[in-house]
Amino acid sequence: MENNVKFVRMKAGVTQEQLAKNVGVTRQTIGLIEKGDYNPTLSLCIAIAKALEKTLDELFWEVE
């Protein structure tokens, strides 16, 4: 699944570890999501969007 999570996270100055802790997953899970190797659940997508203060569209559907 292609997404903007890494771009948005880095722009916000947040590490994978910090984001993972905020949403209740491992750093490895965040890495897999960013690479497109893991399809997160809707609830995890929402948690990531809230943590990064972005919409689901901005993170997962409007890929730049």
Tell me what each language-model feature is:
Residues 10, 38-39:
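Short amphipathic helical patch at the helix-1/turn junction of helix-turn-helix
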Residues 43-58:
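DNA major-groove recognition helix of helix-turn-helix/homeodomain DNA-binding modules
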